[in-house]
Every structure is written in C-alpha cells, then in structure tokens.
C-alpha cells in the first residue's frame, strides 16, 4: 500500500479551529473554540467526536478531514502522544462500511509511515492497521510476510509480548485466506518463547501445529518438533499426530484417525485433506529408498486404485517435491530425486558425501583440462620449432 507525506498548508491553530467548527456543524458535542490547555487537549476532543463524520459525507471528503487530524498528531512529542494515537486508532476501527473502512485504512497507513521509524507508537498503529485491513479484506496490502514485518520495526523492535500479540492477530486474519502465510506466522510466534516461558504457550503451539497440518503447501514439518513450546506437548494427541506427519506412513495416520476421530475433527482438520497429504508424504518417503516403484506397490502403500496411480503421481510432480518419470508400459515410476521429510544426521552425512564426490569429480576435470592445455602448448612449441 502506498502512502503520501502529510502536508497541510495551514498553521496548527488554524487546522484545530477548522476541525472544531466542522465537527460542531455536523452535530458533534464539541466547542468551536480552541482549548486553553493546548493542542493535545484539542486533539483529544476532536478525535473523541471524529467518527461523527462517518454518518454523512463522501469518502474523499472524510479522507481529507482525517488527513488533517493526522498532520496535527505527528507534531505531538512522543512522551505526550501515546494516548492520542491510541484513541485515534480505536476510532479508525469503527468504520461502518467498506468504503469508509478503506478510508480509515489509508489514514492509519499514512500515520504509520509519517511517524518516526524509531517511535514505539508505530507498533500500536500497525496493530490497528491490521485489524482494519481484515475488515476491508486487504490484509496482504499491509502484511506480505515475516521479513517485511521485521523490517518495518527494525529501528524500534517491539517487546516479545507485543510481537506475540501481533503474531496472534496476523494468524487470525490470514488463516482463512492464506494458510501458508498463517503457518509461517505461527512458527515465528513460537520462536519468541524461551525455555523459561514455553510451558505457557500450549494454545499457541497447538494452533501452530494445526495450521501447518492443514496447509496443503506445507510438507516439511520436522522443524516444528524442535520448537520449545511444541516439545511441551509431548505425550498429547496433537503431538502424536504431528509426529505421524513428520515421519510415519499413511497406515499410521489411518489407525490414528480410527482411534481418535473426534479429536481430529475437533481441531478443524479435514480427514480427506489429511489423507491426501499423508499419501504425498508417504510417496516421498518411499522415493527416498526406492529409485523405482511399481504401480502395484503404490496401490498398496497409498491405499488407492491402480487407475488412480498416474493422476496421483502427476499431482506429486506438480509440487516439485519429487522428480520422477512415469513408465506406463511397465507400470513403474522411476525416481530421480526427492525432498527428504526429515533432515537429520543421516541426511547431513549423505549431503557431505555428495559434496565430497562433486569435489573429487571437479578435481579430476581440472587435472584433465590442465593435461590437455599442457599438451596443446607442447604441440604448439614443437610446430614452431619445425617451421
């Protein structure tokens, strides 16, 4: 979302006077005279009634009024501005319809970008900004990812408690439209806990697991097990279910669902979607150890009919998690490579061996090229001597 600098070609006193007159004319309970206590008191009074303009007026006109209020707010010293900014943010969340909601969103974004980047007030503005963006269905306009979020607060990082509150809000506003982004947010949330307070993050940890399991684009789930709040769930059903998705095959999930059907459903997880994901994860695990698989093997391991094998493999290839070739004539699948479901010591050793082999091959190639180059130089010298 773009934002333009705030600039009003009037003095503060003139702006305050005009705003008071404007809101009084709309029927607000406010004096048209300036306060003797100063501009902060004027702002408190103006912000207290500013939502009266939501009842009438065009969005463009209201945007101009709010812009004027913002232009005054950003002049208030930090130590006296917190209550004013918070009051304004609360008013912006009360827009009665979508067009005005977008006006309020733009106003908050303008305020956010015109506050000093080192101001702790930016956190409060951004929190309300996300709330309004949800109302307007424009969350991705103000939040595109965790890296972007952190860069916004690089000069004044919020406290761990503030970030936890913000991450919970971001999870809530993205979970219905972007599960992948929502899952990343929850992982970041759990990363804010330490060994000392991880035990109080039970609810957050459960939400994180459920979001990751429900996301059709999240397949590498092993890192969740290392998060401290998730470790505190060991022995709980949700942790058992996560462990199945991390390293077990389809039959283990089927058995878990038969034994704990109500639990799975109570978490808002879709059984058919779980089956689809577990089939893909099972296929990946089989591909790790079997460079070649028959259709018959896949029908048994994945619990599908033979005529479903080809469509299934095609869907797997679309994810780019596995590289393979279908051999319809011989009813086989030839595996070229696959992403590992877990990446532990064996995988690091395998990677080390692969890199070592590459190093040796490159050394051989370099030696060969050196020999060829030397031979060519010798030949050139000999020909020169002959002539």
UniProtKB/Swiss-Prot annotation:
Coiled coil: none annotated. Component of the eukaryotic translation initiation factor 3 (eIF-3) complex, which is involved in protein synthesis of a specialized repertoire of mRNAs and, together with other initiation factors, stimulates binding of mRNA and methionyl-tRNAi to the 40S ribosome. The eIF-3 complex specifically targets and initiates translation of a subset of mRNAs involved in cell proliferation (Potential). One of its GO terms (biological process) is formation of cytoplasmic translation initiation complex. The keyword Protein biosynthesis applies. Belongs to the eIF-3 subunit M family. One of its GO terms (molecular function) is caspase binding. InterPro entries: COPS7/eIF3m (IPR045237), eIF3m (IPR027528), eIF3m_C_helix (IPR040750), PCI_dom (IPR000717), WH_DNA-bd_sf (IPR036390). GO terms for cellular component: cytosol; eukaryotic 43S preinitiation complex; eukaryotic 48S preinitiation complex; eukaryotic translation initiation factor 3 complex; eukaryotic translation initiation factor 3 complex, eIF3m; Golgi apparatus; investment cone. Component of the eukaryotic translation initiation factor 3 (eIF-3) complex. The eIF-3 complex interacts with pix. The keyword Cytoplasm applies. This is Eukaryotic translation initiation factor 3 subunit M. It is found in: Cytoplasm; Golgi apparatus. Keywords: Cytoplasm, Golgi apparatus, Initiation factor, Protein biosynthesis. It comes from the Eukaryota. SUPFAM superfamilies: Winged helix' DNA-binding domain (SSF46785).
